[in-house]
């Protein structure tokens, strides 16, 4: 297989990823700022399909209207020259100190109103640039102490904010949907909507739930000790996977944002297998940080590695599914039975079926082996390149 990415692979990157300067809580930047236009050009050369942005990635915070217009014009020219797209955009509601207690759920009402206006302004730009998805990450929505936040009231304010944004895009006739990005543990001590499950439950309480889905990130679910492919499967099952952030993570620790494929390689394999077998048509969006050890050449090597690793895993997953021995092992593990309804004949037939209870041989059923180890080893063989 050719591991050279093309726009048909639909790989996208946030401007904040390749543009990260390496500044962290313990050290200053190790790289100079990256011009968004250069980011567009270099990513296009690598074979990417598009770029995404926070408002402040593209337009420095506090810019005048004239400065804003100039930044957008340069960016649009770069998009036109390279053929790159903007499938998604989002708002930075976490960097400026005004958001120290949150944005949509800040205790200060005037901060909440400012956060909504800031978001609405960038939604207009996102639609202008062709984005179909608007991501919302509530990184500062939470607390460090119990009395500091009335969580029920905060969820009311969160619902109010999303309902207002839904009203706005509907009134404007915008063809755009929202994707809530869950994350636990940082930067707030306890963050609202920390996992996929929290976000899915919240969405069902909104006035226009059809406008809202999730934007799960590999590292975020793993920070909570959860199985990311399982979370994605549930989001797909619910029809709520509107966007996805790909990166790498090594277990339950801080948000590492490694390049995709680094960290938990088995989880990355099963994730790619799931996305490809499910026919996921959205972008494969990389939200990672090139390590602060790298110079600018290392930034592009890291970005290229994200795409290459996805394509390698895509090839390995396809070989796994096409392997006749794997197909036989799947049947031995009775995956075909799992796809069958348990009681398609209805409740009354189930209650009348003596083989379902009275005559069911529980000891014989308990003695059946599931053959999962053989199946898993076949997957390992394909992942490690020993088969196919």
UniProtKB/Swiss-Prot annotation:
Catalytic activity annotation: alpha-D-xylose = alpha-D-xylulofuranose
Protein's cellular compartments: Cytoplasm
Keyword Metal-binding: yes
Active site: 54, 57
Presence of the UniProt keyword Lipid biosynthesis in the record: no
Positions bound to Mg(2+) 1: 181, 217, 245, 287
A Pfam family it matches: AP_endonuc_2
The organism's place on the tree of life at top rank: Bacteria
Keywords in alphabetical order: Carbohydrate metabolism, Cytoplasm, Isomerase, Magnesium, Metal-binding, Xylose metabolism
First-listed, main subcellular location of the protein, grouped into a coarse class: cytoplasm
Molecular function in Gene Ontology: magnesium ion binding; xylose isomerase activity
GO BP terms: D-xylose metabolic process
Binding, Mg(2+) 2: 217, 220, 255, 257
EC number: 5.3.1.5
GO cellular component: cytoplasm
InterPro entries, sorted: Xyl_isomerase-like_sf, Xyl_isomerase-like_TIM-brl, XylA_actinobac, Xylose_isomerase
Cofactor note: Binds 2 magnesium ions per subunit.
Cofactor(s) the protein needs: Mg(2+)
Homology family: Belongs to the xylose isomerase family.
Subunit structure: Homotetramer.
PANTHER family: PTHR48408, XYLOSE ISOMERASE
Name under which the protein is recorded: Xylose isomerase
Taxonomy of the source species: Bacteria, Bacillati, Actinomycetota, Actinomycetes, Kitasatosporales
